[in-house]
């Protein structure tokens, strides 16, 4: 018989703001910033490598923060937290702004070629 799933932590909007703020701050801790930078450099802006190298480091950093709020210390906890944040994004502009900031810490900036740098026409 399968056991009942663990109770998902519930956070109020205010609590979600606090946790999200702590997660963002965790990426600024020198040790974590160095880990992320090393993973990004190893990935060489290749999206496949970003998923293999950067995402696991980012997940670990988030797990270190959110486990104190009842989320499990596995990838599932980060996914549940992300769903909770997504739900509150539409209700709270501060959470929406922090969510954008967190995503910018996780995803590489999209580099687009300069306009006019295509194939020369002659």
Curated annotation (Swiss-Prot):
Example GO biological process term? post-embryonic development
Does this UniProt record's set of keywords contain Cytoplasm? yes
Compartments reported by the entry? Cytoplasm
Per the record, its GO cellular-component terms are: cytoplasm
Alphabetical keyword list: Cytoplasm
Record PANTHER family: PROTEIN C10 (PTHR13463:SF3)
Instruction: Give the protein family.
Output: Belongs to the UPF0456 family.
Q: This chain belongs to which protein, by name?
A: Protein C10
Q: Which species does the entry assign this protein to?
A: Danio rerio
């Amino acid at each position: 018989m399968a056991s009942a799933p663990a109770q998902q932590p519930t956070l109020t909007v205010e609590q979600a703001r606090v946790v999200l703020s702590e997660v963002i701050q965790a990426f600024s801790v020198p040790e974590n910033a160095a880990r992320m930078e090393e993973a990004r450099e190893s990935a060489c802006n290749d999206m496949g490598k970003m998923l293999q190298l950067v995402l696991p480091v980012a997940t670990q950093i988030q797990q270190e923060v959110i486990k104190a709020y009842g989320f499990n210390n596995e990838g599932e906890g980060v996914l549940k937290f992300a769903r909770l944040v997504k739900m509150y994004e539409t209700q709270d502009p501060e959470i929406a702004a922090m969510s954008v900031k967190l995503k910018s810490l996780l995803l590489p900036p999209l580099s687009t070629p300069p306009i006019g740098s295509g194939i020369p026409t002659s």
